[in-house]
């Protein structure tokens, strides 16, 4: 009789403990979801504020009254038309381009890291950046127009991805290490081709243009090209965003993905292709910009963890904000504009070192 009562009391205690544990887990999830929403709100507000601030900054001074008047109403005087041209033809396309490129490179880096299961994967790992740079340099050396040169950059960026997949097919393997090694081979070849073009280029005219392109800059943007690439960026981001949950399963291995009913080979084609298209389009807009696709995903992981459902949206916002700040500093620090690639490297490398040391200290605890 006593044993029966004792067993019933144990069952009641187990039920109470399980209920409390469930309540604690539910409260923790609610707190995490609330903090995640607050982070998204903060990033969106910061991005909008930085975009508006960038409209005032530049060699041509604009007051708050000028910007508000031009954005809300139609300019009438000749002087106000000049200011409107500065905003709508120069600064606004540049702000949009910096945001798109920052978000695109960051999301592409996070996608590569998930698919290749390598934390050091970046937009350079599959040779897309190097191939796009070669395409642009080839157009410059051949004296082609700006539009044709950027088209060459995009075509060669896609060609590099086809070569990587071709090497993986010849190797008859879709393992991450094989893909990375194939990308390194393709990247090395296109880096060598760029060096050949720099060697053959005219040192008085063509060579400086190639070097300036490789350093990265938004100074030579074409407004129509910026707006024409917006749908491409949005489509690629939409594909990755819709498949963001599958990256969590892919990181566990192909066998786990098959158990969950996924097609790992198809995902390993769709996700890298979408990321590579954004990388090529980014190189088309501003040339070579490093560290963004490597540093920003690591920074966001320190904030929201490894869940790609939260990682991808926050990475896009952080990348856009980061490169927008870098571009604003590039045209505000000195009278002569500093290439964006230089400032992104000077900022990204110390930031990555900080995250690296912080992670090492956390592992030792």
Kindly give the residue locations of the regions a language model identified.
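Alpha-helical transmembrane segments in inner-membrane proteins
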Residues: 4-365
């Amino acid at each position: 009789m006593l044993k029966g009562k004792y067993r019933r009391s144990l069952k009641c205690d187990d039920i109470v403990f399980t209920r409390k544990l469930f309540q604690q887990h539910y409260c923790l999830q609610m707190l995490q979801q609330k903090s995640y929403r607050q982070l998204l709100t903060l990033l969106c507000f910061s991005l909008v504020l930085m975009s508006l601030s960038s409209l005032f900054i530049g060699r041509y001074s604009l007051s708050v009254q000028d910007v508000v008047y031009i954005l809300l109403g139609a300019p009438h005087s000749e002087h106000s038309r000049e200011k409107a041209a500065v905003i709508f033809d120069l600064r606004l396309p540049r702000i949009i381009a910096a945001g798109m490129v920052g978000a695109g490179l960051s999301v592409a880096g996070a996608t590569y890291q998930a698919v290749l299961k390598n934390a050091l994967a970046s937009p350079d790992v599959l040779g897309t950046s190097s191939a796009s740079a070669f395409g642009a340099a080839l157009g410059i050396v051949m004296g082609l127009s700006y539009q044709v040169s950027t088209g060459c950059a995009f075509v060669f960026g896609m060609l590099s991805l086809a070569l990587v997949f071709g090497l993986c097919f010849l190797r008859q393997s879709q393992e991450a290490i094989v893909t990375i090694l194939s990308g390194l081979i393709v990247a090395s070849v296109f880096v060598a081709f760029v060096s050949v073009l720099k060697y053959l280029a005219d040192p008085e005219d063509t060579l400086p243009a190639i070097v300036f392109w490789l350093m990265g800059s938004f100074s030579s943007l074409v407004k129509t090209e910026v707006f024409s690439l917006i749908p491409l960026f949005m489509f690629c981001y939409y594909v990755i965003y819709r498949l963001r949950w599958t990256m969590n399963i892919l990181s566990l291995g192909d066998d786990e993905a098959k158990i969950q009913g996924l097609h790992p080979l198809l995902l390993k084609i769709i996700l890298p292709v979408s990321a590579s298209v954004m990388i090529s389009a980014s190189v088309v807009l501003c040339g070579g910009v490093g560290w963004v696709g490597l540093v920003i995903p690591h920074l966001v992981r320190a904030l929201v963890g490894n869940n790609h459902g939260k990682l991808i949206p926050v990475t896009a916002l952080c990348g856009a904000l980061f490169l927008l700040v870098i571009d604003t500093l590039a045209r505000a620090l000195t009278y002569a504009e500093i290439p964006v690639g230089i400032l992104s490297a000077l900022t990204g490398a110390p930031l990555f070192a900080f995250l690296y040391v912080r992670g090492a200290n956390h592992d030792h605890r």
